[in-house]
Amino acid sequence: MLFKSFLEKIKTTLSRLSPARRIFLSFALVILLGSLLLSLPFVQATTSQATYFDHLFTTVSMVCVTGLFTQPVASTYNIWGQLICMLLIQIGGLGLMTFIGIFYIQGKQKLSLRGRETIQESFSYGETQSLKDFIHSIFLTTFLVEGIGAFLLSFRFIPEFGWGRGVLTSIFLAVSAFCNAGFDNFGSTSLLAFQTDPLINLVIAGLIITGGLGFMVWFDLATQFGKKKKRRLRFHTKLVLFLTAGILLFGTVSTLLIEWNNPGTIGNLSAPEKLLVSFFQTVSMRTAGFASIDYTQARPVTLFIYILQMFLGGAPGGTAGGLKITTFFVLLVFARSELLGLPHANVARRTIEPRTVQKSFSVFIIFLLTFLLGLILLGITAEGNPRFIYLMFETISALATVGVTANLTPELGKIALSIVMLLMFIGRIGPLTLLVSVAEYQPDKKDTIHYMKADITIG
């Protein structure tokens, strides 16, 4: 009853806001409450040395499903604190409004139009008729995949840590991996201790890929089962699957070739182990943030390729961050049509709508400018004159909600860490959503007037 009353108050507070502002405020609210919960004395481990700023940074990173931290989870929070961490990651991955939506659906109450719009905005879901089924699909997919992942991981962690810690670790990692959060409850070395373990690496990689594909893809795939007459997969689904496979192949091969003889990363491993680590790192770099190599030992060109992968991110409508692979694909198709002098952006016997192209350009420009501004600010405020490639790595890791670091996060001061927090928050809700929520621009009559065409020379 208390939780239901709390949800009712949230609904009342957010009912008059636009979808963009509701997304903005819902994440801000969860971050505030989460930081206060993690600050409570009874959730602290006996070895904890964290301040409120550390709890706030951790909460922002968890709700924004990033993975950066100033204090390790294992040495900072006891079992109760780690359960709160899992809840924050889960809410961050799915969104507070989605949780509110499922409570209303389960209670057989009608979800308001603004609530539907907010959930659609959160997951870039354009259809309205099957929104209820879509929300059910989100939760079913999430808990089913996380459950299977935790079950498989338990075969390794229960013998390693015993029943209590083994089960907790399995569930924690499954939730973190599916939500592309990159957090673990081992310590500060991520998965380096399990670098060549095929079970752990492949299960976590599978969870990351599943979450990164986006719920629209899984909803589309799920509708193929249980029907006598199969309908064709949506073009979006086919595109995401194709692009994901291509990026994973490119990243794996490039890491394998560049780092093959590097003893600081994979040089001392066997050929199958090199392939496993290269594949896992490529999967993780897209938006998850689990580390199985020391990035300070990687070659600069490898880090640059990782930066590009983080910039592109995963698919829209899921737990992944970054620019989004479909956005980049639209830009490539448009560039091709311009080079060939074609009147429309065509691909696979389909025409991309001009509005989609315009939105893709807007997202790309805003994302790029946010990255550059964050890089400049982080370079100004970072202490110790770190390498430029590490600053780029840290900046895009935060903005794309990946969560990897070349050991730079623990060395940053509070001003620089505040910039990292802001980048994580912007990256999670989306730069475009942030601008819309802040500006809430309403066009006036002047914007409907068609003026003389401006003749501007470009290129």
Please give the residue ranges for each predicted region.
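Membrane-proximal intracellular helices of multi-pass ion channels
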Residues: M1-G459
